[in-house]
Amino acid sequence: MYILWLDAAEFENKGGWKLETQFVRAVGQSYLIACDIPGDPVNDAIAEFDVKENGRYRVFVRTKNWKYPEAPGRFNVIVDGKELPAVCGKMPTQSWYWEIAGDIELGCGKHTVSLHDLTGWLARCAAVIITDDMDFVPSPETERLQKQRRQIKGISDEIKNCGEWDFVVVGAGPGGVPAAIAAARHGLKTALITGRPTVGGNASREGTIGLDGAGSRHLGFHETGIANEIKRIREYKNCTWQEAMELLIANEENITVFCNELCIDADTVDSKISSATTINAITLEKSVFKGKMFADCSGDAWLGYYAGAAYRIGREAKWQYNEKFAPEDADTLTMSGCICAQPDPDKRKFRGYRAENTNNPVIFKAPDWAVKLPEGDELHRTPMGDAIDSPWWVENSNDFDDLWDDEFCRDQLVRIAVGYFDWVKNSWSGKEKCTNYKLTGLALHNSKRENRRLIGDYVLNQNDFDGRTDFDDGVTYCGWSIDLHHPKGLFSGKEGPFYSNQNVPLT
């Protein structure tokens, strides 16, 4: 009996497919996604494999129909140049599933398997299984799937011990990086852990969101502390926020960075965190980090959640803090993220989509699965700048769950971005400005806004901002407007994109 398991990350030649690691917690593994020029099929992803005996083999793929029923992301599997019969990615479900791509006669020796994109619209493949056991069926359940994978690949389920640390920081974004640097400068042996391939979080080249605060609203003012050090390096070096953080981290010998390590559990002793467990987003190897102190800078408060800390999601009712902008009744609404990208540090970053002026008329017809927006001025929006990407207000309504349904939310943002480009090209009253625009890229990283919030000894609320509250244990000055987007997102009509945009007083 022969069973070969190929992870998406193991494809040596990924062609035009990109490795997606944002959703390992939900999907159970990383996956390849076909994304380059929207609507143009990408180059094949190719992997080599060996079989030891001549015979008939079955090929499974783990895939997803990410928008049922239209099935935008369809692909074929090709073995040794022969196309297998199934068109993958179109089953009537939006869950991840295993599909038989086909059976094929193989001789002993080396072979190739290719993923052949058919649409150019985000086809997905997480794994390929090749077996001569016609009774074998891979499990659809994430936990059992990972167990099957370990057994087939001969991987131990032992958790790797990554040592003991003075300070463990989970999350390496605008919160985690300064926390780690401050600790390192005080002599603490610090582990800086991120589930992403780089540091930076929302300010990385994936996220593209800057560390802007009150300094961007008040002439002559700027943020203080380590955040300002990062900003000064960025301005002096003319580099990205991510590169500025990397330069600052490199100067601290007490910091060790662990990328692609996603926090999935925590242990406590007497209600104090003693260790954090992570899973590698690519290899799925588990590790444990023991420490004397921990900081949850994960953005979604995963460490605190696993440790059993109190938390809230959504908006508190007005009676709780008597905040001017609070609703009368509590709810679970959270602001949508935006999909963002900067594929190359020398190229401009963009939100939603990227369009380029071809200097010749270009026709664009939106796919059936793109979100259909109100015609013309009925959308009650005016594109910002030259409309070569989408504004910050191209977002989901606030009842979408970015925490537990994050892949679906990202995909909905893709549908909205394509629908918005269609509106700009074909419906907006100023559409003649975009006659020569061609859709050339889609952003895939969901730069999230607020989500789960851990409850500490003091809850900062709107009255602290309005009343200029000073705190004896303050460590820095920062700020932004009370920037609340409309709960209906892009679909707020004549009510506009803001629920509040009130400036915060300087102290």
Label the model's feature ranges.
Residues 182, 188-189, 194-269, 312, ...:
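Conserved N-terminal/central alpha/beta ligand/cofactor-binding core
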Residues 164-166, 186-190, 253-256, 287, ...:
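Loop/turn elements at helix/coil->beta-strand transitions in domains of secreted/extracellular proteins
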Residues 176:
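N-terminal Rossmann-fold NAD(P) dinucleotide-binding loop
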Residues 161-173:
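Beta1/beta-strand and adjacent pyrophosphate-binding region of the FAD-binding site
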Residues 156-161, 202, 260, 275, ...:
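Flavin (FAD/FMN)-binding glycine-rich loop and adjacent Rossmann-like elements that form
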Residues 1-158:
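Extracytoplasmic
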Residues 71-72, 124-127, 139-142, 180-182, ...:
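Short, solvent-exposed loop/turn and secondary-structure capping segments
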Residues 270-276:
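Short, hydrophobic/aromatic-rich segments at coil-to-beta transitions
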